[in-house]
Swiss-Prot record:
Reactions this protein catalyses: quinoline + A + H2O = quinolin-2(1H)-one + AH2
Principal EC category: oxidoreductase
Subunit text: Heterohexamer of two alpha chains, two beta chains, and two gamma chains.
Keywords: FAD, Flavoprotein, Oxidoreductase
Pathway given in the UniProt record: Xenobiotic degradation; quinoline degradation
Signal peptide: none
GO MF assignments: quinoline 2-oxidoreductase activity
The protein, known as: Quinoline 2-oxidoreductase beta chain
Species this protein is from: Comamonas testosteroni
Length: 10
């Protein structure tokens, strides 16, 4: 994942 998954909670 190139995006912060922890921030999206996804």
């Amino acid at each position: 994942m190139k995006f912060p998954a922890f921030a999206y909670x996804r």
